[in-house]
């Protein structure tokens, strides 16, 4: 019953979803969830062509997307990092360079995906992906888990002397009205030089 319920929830999330045992503790105990996921992953390994549940690493699974040309695809570093943080009960924020790339302020793709976290500094290898987690101060993690956090990190990448109207415009367009309200509220916890920039973003029509 537990295995069936877990499988239904996974399939309901759709292909590309990544998950950990902690995502299913409302269904059963940790031991029973571990057993169910292991059983589903073993079934998927035996029936690779069906694209069932796949074990990515210890305590980390996915329901892989499929491409007509390339077959089952590997999950993105961003999705993996979020799942790892969720599994370990940590908060997560992209590094300044990653945030700038995500918001279109930089075309440079970091060679190694790096995330700031309230957990220990470590490197996590999942399949071909090598992801760096760096312990950061609470001020660096303001807005973590929201678009606002990505904006603050992107501003760190740009720097106070390089912010112009084009950057303000791009950042403003990345946020909806609720995001802008949250940005204004959270800005009290970021460096003072960001305050006037945040005001411009919030006021942007």
Identify the role of each PLM range:
Residues 2, 27, 82-84, 90, ...:
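Positively charged, aromatic-accented nucleic-acid-binding surfaces
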Residues 20-21, 112-114, 167:
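Short coil/turn segments at secondary-structure boundaries
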Residues 130-134:
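Short, aliphatic-rich beta-strand segments
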Residues 21, 118, 136:
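Fold-independent oxyanion-binding glycine-rich loops
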Residues 136-205:
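Hydrophobic alpha-helical interaction segments
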């Amino acid at each position: 019953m537990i295995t069936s319920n877990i499988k239904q929830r996974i399939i309901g999330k759709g292909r590309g979803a990544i998950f950990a045992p902690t995502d299913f503790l409302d269904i059963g105990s940790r031991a029973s969830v571990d057993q169910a996921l292991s059983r589903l992953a073993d079934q998927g390994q035996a029936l690779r062509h069906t694209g069932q549940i796949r074990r990515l690493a210890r305590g980390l699974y996915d329901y892989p997307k499929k491409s007509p040309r390339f077959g089952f695809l590997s999950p993105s570093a961003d999705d993996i990092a979020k799942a790892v943080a969720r599994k370990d009960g940590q908060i997560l924020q992209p590094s300044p360079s990653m945030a700038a790339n995500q918001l279109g302020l930089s075309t440079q793709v970091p060679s190694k995906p790096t995330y700031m976290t309230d957990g220990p500094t470590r490197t996590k290898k999942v399949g071909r992906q090598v992801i760096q987690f760096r312990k950061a101060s609470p001020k660096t993690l303001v807005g973590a888990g929201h678009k606002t956090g990505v904006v603050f990190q992107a501003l760190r990448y740009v720097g106070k002397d390089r912010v112009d109207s084009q950057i303000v415009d791009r950042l403003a367009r990345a946020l909806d009205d609720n995001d802008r309200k949250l940005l204004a509220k959270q800005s009290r916890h970021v460096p003072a030089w960001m305050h006037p920039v945040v005001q411009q973003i919030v006021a942007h029509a």
